[in-house]
Amino acid sequence: MLLRRRNGPCPFPLLLLLLAHCICIWPASAARDRYARQNNRQRHQDIDRDRDRDRFLYRSSSAQNRQRGGANFALGLGANGVTIPTSLEDKNKNEFVKGKICIGTKSRLSVPSNKEHHYRNLRDRYTNCTYVDGNLKLTWLPNENLDLSFLDNIREVTGYILISHVDVKKVVFPKLQIIRGRTLFSLSVEEEKYALFVTYSKMYTLEIPDLRDVLNGQVGFHNNYNLCHMRTIQWSEIVSNGTDAYYNYDFTAPERECPKCHESCTHGCWGEGPKNCQKFSKLTCSPQCAGGRCYGPKPRECCHLFCAGGCTGPTQKDCIACKNFFDEAVSKEECPPMRKYNPTTYVLETNPEGKYAYGATCVKECPGHLLRDNGACVRSCPQDKMDKGGECVPCNGPCPKTCPGVTVLHAGNIDSFRNCTVIDGNIRILDQTFSGFQDVYANYTMGPRYIPLDPERREVFSTVKEITGYLNIEGTHPQFRNLSYFRNLETIHGRQLMESMFAALAIVKSSLYSLEMRNLKQISSGSVVIQHNRDLCYVSNIRWPAIQKEPEQKVWVNENLRADLCEKNGTICSDQCNEDGCWGAGTDQCLTCKNFNFNGTCIADCGYISNAYKFDNRTCKICHPECRTCNGAGADHCQECVHVRDGQHCVSECPKNKYNDRGVCRECHATCDGCTGPKDTIGIGACTTCNLAIINNDATVKRCLLKDDKCPDGYFWEYVHPQEQGSLKPLAGRAVCRKCHPLCELCTNYGYHEQVCSKCTHYKRREQCETECPADHYTDEEQRECFQRHPECNGCTGPGADDCKSCRNFKLFDANETGPYVNSTMFNCTSKCPLEMRHVNYQYTAIGPYCAASPPRSSKITANLDVNMIFIITGAVLVPTICILCVVTYICRQKQKAKKETVKMTMALSGCEDSEPLRPSNIGANLCKLRIVKDAELRKGGVLGMGAFGRVYKGVWVPEGENVKIPVAIKELLKSTGAESSEEFLREAYIMASEEHVNLLKLLAVCMSSQMMLITQLMPLGCLLDYVRNNRDKIGSKALLNWSTQIAKGMSYLEEKRLVHRDLAARNVLVQTPSLVKITDFGLAKLLSSDSNEYKAAGGKMPIKWLALECIRNRVFTSKSDVWAFGVTIWELLTFGQRPHENIPAKDIPDLIEVGLKLEQPEICSLDIYCTLLSCWHLDAAMRPTFKQLTTVFAEFARDPGRYLAIPGDKFTRLPAYTSQDEKDLIRKLAPTTDGSEAIAKPDDYLQPKAAPGPSHRTDCTDEMPKLNRYCKDPSNKNSSTGDDERDSSAREVGVGNLRLDLPVDEDDYLMPTCQPGPNNNNNMNNPNQNNMAAVGVAAGYMDLIGVPVSVDNPEYLLNAQTLGVGESPIPTQTIGIPVMGGPGTMEVKVPMPGSEPTSSDHEYYNDTQRELQPLHRNRNTETRV
């Protein structure tokens, strides 16, 4: 009708409708606008008035909500859920149908700033929601008329339900069936945790008629004024653990009288009417249901075990709710896997029915804000995986550094984000971030006080690219003007959203002027809320949907600085930005560019950039680095090159087979292998090298040849060594043609002999070439060869004696001729005339001597005269000469004899006669330096331990006149000790000062004040035994094998110095740094004699389980016995500090070792290392390896540690770090009284400041050194019991062969001394000289029982005979340290037994000074043994 009359006059009804609109609608709209403005002003007043109240903490949740209650700032909310489609048909009528999934909240009981807006948030969050993923909190609803119908569709809550301060009279959850209780609510004052908790509410009824199951947690009701019917509910039917509900009512007024349940209700009810009767599916079941659910009372009416809250039938499809997972109307224990095994093909294949586990639901695809990992929807990837396209995939190499988010950013946690790429969680910057605050723990105890955060420290976020949760900014500070430190942030995933307004990016009431997050490309989930920022510009012009992933994501940007004021202030986008807006001022802050984008900066044209080109209509890109100008991508589009051009490409340098010719690459000569020019030689402008080259005699290259060419005539082929460093270095590893020897025309190597020279330049003589034939040769010009002439010829024309030109001796003419002729050549040469021509004729000078048949005239007389003259002349010369020589010799000998007699007379008269002959030992002088320091230079700290004659302190050495502090350990000799202890003290200093090695504890100095002190390096990390026990999970194979190698190196050094340690164990190896260990305890080390390889001890405790059998039986100690102890020490390391033979008594060890007992193979130890350890435990000492061999073996192991030790997680083990700050703290503790201005120095750097730099294992020692086992107890307390692993004074029976001995053995398997004191021991102690001279009987002890003669225990005693009171002893006749008797007799050592010393105790086995210093006495009837 309206269409037919559209051109005619308006009908009357339409006029009335228009009038009604003018009268009613417009005033209503105006009133609504006025109400909105008034409400807005009221809201600002409420926010300002409630700023302090925002921090109000309810007593059960104060610690969890200290970040400011004003977080609930929302002014509006849009629902943000995940809809999961279902394939159920309507005819199934199954109640378990998932629809919309909503995210729960975590704000507990925090008070909202605006309760009306709080109600709107709840309404928008849960409208049409059927599945709450998290907690459902219904709080602070004081208006009893509020509509709660938005709760009608909720069927399942995965967390807990909290109802607090709700005044609505009736709260109804008509379809709620199950509360899973995966997260529970708890009051801090009580231990109970609740899945349903109702408190301080004035509602009359809480109606949940379909609630069937609470899988975890309890139910509680606390101080509810009017709530009825809750006490009638049979909670054991609902709560899975079967407990009853918790009720508490503390008000003075009595509880409200509640109406009775409907008559149709068999037990309890939720409210009035039959629909609120409690339903039962557990208490009414048959016993055959085994405590599960049922759908009837009969035995066969039990629900499936996967059902929760009851069922309608016996199968998995009949469940009302699922206990584990819901998969298309079927309850399952697990979701269908994404991959399944194919038994036919034996491979894993993709499962077409596979689904992901999301909460208690199986879904085909995970929600957009979650990640896929191993068939589950997760919020973050595990440590070894990274997010790639919404799926967790293994990292290719190191994973991007991921840091956990924080509830509030403050000065205490900001440094944890340094170098982070991904923040797994949320970032919140609040007012207290910049003002500081006092932390309060969940148990209401005071936490740390955080200082205000300097805004400059926020630069740590410059490396962050992703935030998996949300970013919340609510802080103000004068310097907090922008978010430029998030300039590299690319994605906010929003896997966790703020409870108010579902915000992923929320900036409220901040002091920001601009955002400047120029690289933010996407907000995957959640809304954008930017409100009440009075100085913030630019945000209103940003097109937020361009960076939001889903269209339903909301944006609230309002009540910031007005656009006209921003424009007035000039805080507007650049003219190069398009309508999408910008993050701040500048052309690099645009979301998109109006013209062109060049590396994130907007420009008007690509021509403004010299080395850029137009990639497309919107993008400029930089030219290739080798292009100075270009017209496209790649080095082949260059218009001008930066370096050189090779064909169509610009390159940084010419390829190997080309050279640079004024910016263009030209081909090298064909024979070159790389070049700088066109020539075919080697040098500038020629080849760099070539495969084959002809060289001159001066080793310069004449020209290059091709690889397959042959050397020309006159040259030979020669290989150039790869290490060549001379003029032929460019040809190293290649070949050259070297010129033959000048005497050789054709050759195969340099030389002129037949083996290398095939043709001579001039002549050949035998096997070598000659320039010309020698005089004793003749020349064959045709063959150009020299032949040897006849021996009797002087010049010849042939090889025979008849070819001579002249003779060496005599000519022999033909016998038929009557006489020689001057020009006759018919003769032979001979060395001796024949009998028939035995006469030599010298008459003809031109002919020379020749053989003749008859003598010449007067030849006989002439011959006789010549012989006589020779004898006369010879005799006349020789006889006088001999006589003169004899006379001179006699006179010299007489003078020498007189001079000796004069010297002897002079020495006798002057008293300088030396009757003692020299006995040179050929041993060099010990020139090691021993530094002496003053007592005032030392600052002692706490006691590290005690020994038999001293204490060990940690301390600091401050050298006088120098501004330096050195951490040291100070060993101080007690004043109560005697002279013998002082001697032993100095002997230890002598040994430690004489030996210097990187793996031996270094003696720094000695203090000779009233109390003698040794100053050594301070080992900050204690002994290696404790270190491996305390850091077992952090020690890898590399560290273990490095320590083993270092111990072997230190012991190899002692072996070279002929020192026997005697007590090598892990407890006597100290740790300076995690990479450096040092062997300690030289107090028991003994120097071997130069003519002996063993040392025999007469007393002292012995670590039985660390010693070789010969040590236990005969007390014989050698370097090979140290090898046995080394094997046990390495076994301790590989077992991380286990005790050897822990369950075997020490008294049984000798017998068991003799029958083949060995330590078992450690779990992490390979067979290679264990075989090495077994070689150290050979019963025959000669079969054991040396320490030099062990050093080589373990160094080889350390090069491939993973091959020889199998430690779980080896690659992830990291030893504890040791920082310079720890060093400074230690110095502050050790020397608190110093002014602190001194610099900290390493002991090695201080003592050797000019050492050449090089690799060194020395590091700073700045930590406290644990107690050394060597100094365990106060030696003055002789009755004390140690009670530890190092000592045990109880005696034990030890077996040696078939002999059983009752010997004292301590708990650490140390064999106690067996010698007993003589009856006059006390007197001898008071008079050592008398004791030394007296003969003391040998007491019956261990050494006597086994029949081994007692040996010299202290050879160094002979060095100090006067000190020890042996004044009458003859001077030793051998080297220092080698005890030798001065007469024909022998020597016997008689040692007193322990017990005669009143101060002796079990812990003195390291400092057994009385036994070690016993004087030696001579006995002519005994034999010397060393």
From Swiss-Prot:
Residues 938-1198 form the Protein kinase domain. The keyword RNA-binding does not apply. Residues 1-30 form the signal peptide. Residues 890-1426 are cytoplasmic. Changing residue 936 to T: In EGFR-ELP-B1 and EGFR-ELP-B1RB1. Glycans are attached at residues 128, 241, 419, 443, 482, 569, 599, 617, 816, 823, 828. InterPro entries: Furin-like_Cys-rich_dom, Furin_repeat, GF_recep_IV, Growth_fac_rcpt_cys_sf, Kinase-like_dom_sf, Prot_kinase_dom, Protein_kinase_ATP_BS, Rcpt_L-dom. Ubiquitination by Cbl in response to high spi, promotes its interaction with Graf and thus facilitates its GPI-enriched endocytic compartment (GEEC) mediated endocytosis and its subsequent degradation. ATP binds at residues 944-952, 971. Its main location: membrane. Changing residue 347 to A: In dim-arm; Does not form dimers even in the presence of Spitz. Residues 1257-1276 have a biased composition (Basic and acidic residues). Belongs to the protein kinase superfamily. Tyr protein kinase family. EGF receptor subfamily. Homodimer. Binding of the ligand spitz triggers homodimerization of the receptor however, it is able to form dimers, albeit weakly, in the absence of spitz. Interacts (when phosphorylated on tyrosine residues) with Vav (via SH2 domain). Interacts (when ubiquitinated) with Graf. May interact (when phosphorylated) with EGFRAP (via SH2 domain). Receptor tyrosine kinase, binding ligands of the EGF family and activating several signaling cascades to convert extracellular cues into appropriate cellular responses. Known ligands include spitz, gurken, vein and giant-lens. Transduces the signal through the ras-raf-MAPK pathway. Critical for the proliferation of imaginal tissues, and for the determination of both the antero-posterior and dorso-ventral polarities of the oocyte. This is Epidermal growth factor receptor. The lineage of its organism: Eukaryota, Metazoa, Ecdysozoa, Arthropoda, Hexapoda.
